[in-house]
């Protein structure tokens, strides 16, 4: 599933633009939604983020690796950059506590994420995208 340079740039700058990606997980105690400021497009088949907080989202991933990621940016919609203003990604996460994939994810993060307190103890999370669409169900632009 090709992800355009435009979408890559929007997602990479989501936190700085005030439109962070939200990660939805579910576990034995119910669902959880967490902002993930480190979310990036890893490649055309994956999103990735750096798990530093190690709280409810990580606990839920220990029970169920299925996730949803939503990106909402009303300014991009108003400016005509992103028609619906919303993107949804559904997929399966894989946790990388060590090894080459952890290091590869870390290398792709923005500098503010690489130097953030606790970054050295973070976990790389790679999300295989199984389907993605805008909020109206249209394919990614």
Identify what each model region corresponds to.
Residues 1-141:
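Binding-site signature for planar aromatic cofactors or substrates
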């Amino acid at each position: 599933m090709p992800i355009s340079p435009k979408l890559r740039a929007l997602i990479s700058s989501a936190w700085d633009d005030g439109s962070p990606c939200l990660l939805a997980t579910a576990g034995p105690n119910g669902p959880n939604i967490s902002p993930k400021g480190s979310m990036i497009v890893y490649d055309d088949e994956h999103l990735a983020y750096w798990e530093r907080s190690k709280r409810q989202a990580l606990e839920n991933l220990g029970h169920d690796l299925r996730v949803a990621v939503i990106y909402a940016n009303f300014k991009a919609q108003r400016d005509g950059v992103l028609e619906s203003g919303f993107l949804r990604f559904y997929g399966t996460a894989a946790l990388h506590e060590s090894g080459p994939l952890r290091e590869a994810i870390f290398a792709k993060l923005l500098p503010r994420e690489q130097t953030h307190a606790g970054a050295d103890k973070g976990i790389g999370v790679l999300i295989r995208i199984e389907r993605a669409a805008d909020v109206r169900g249209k394919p990614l632009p």
